[in-house]
């Protein structure tokens, strides 16, 4: 479970990825955000969406993002440095 600092960091990063502010991250938004991390392919985006979008609705909800972030703390620390 995320502590208050970790939750605040998840909130901040989620808002960076959720460019249109609709409360969910689309594949397009994910791709745009990941371009900041370097070269990313369409297949990379599809693979990440499949992993993080656990309910399969085509979007990453805040809960799905938070669950992924909590399970991948090292990766999220790296992402936080960039965003």
From Swiss-Prot:
Cellular component per GO?
cytoplasm
InterPro entries this protein is in? EF-hand-dom_pair, EF_Hand_1_Ca_BS, EF_hand_dom, EF_hand_pair_protein_CML-like
Annotated residues for binding of Ca(2+) 1 = 18, 20, 22, 24, 29
Keyword terms: Allergen, Calcium, Metal-binding, Repeat
- Is Heme there in the keyword field? no
Q: Which positions fall inside the EF-hand domain?
A: 5-40, 43-75
The record's section on Pfam families has: EF-hand_7 (PF13499)
Q: Is the keyword Glycosyltransferase assigned to this protein?
A: no
Concerning CDD domains, the annotation shows:
EFh
List the SUPFAM superfamilies: EF-hand
Residue ranges annotated as transmembrane are: none
UniProt signal peptide: none
Gene3D superfamilies registered for this protein in UniProt: EF-hand
Binding-site list for Ca(2+) 2: 53, 55, 57, 59, 64
GO MF annotation list: calcium ion binding; enzyme regulator activity
This chain belongs to the protein called Polcalcin Bra r 2
């Amino acid at each position: 479970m995320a502590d208050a600092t970790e939750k605040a960091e998840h909130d901040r990063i989620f808002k960076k990825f959720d460019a249109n502010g609709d409360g969910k991250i689309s594949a397009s938004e994910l791709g745009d955000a990941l371009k900041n991390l370097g070269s990313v392919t369409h297949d990379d985006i599809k693979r990440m969406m499949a992993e993080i979008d656990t309910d399969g609705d085509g979007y990453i909800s805040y809960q799905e993002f938070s669950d992924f972030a909590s399970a991948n703390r090292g990766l999220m620390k790296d992402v936080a440095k960039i965003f």
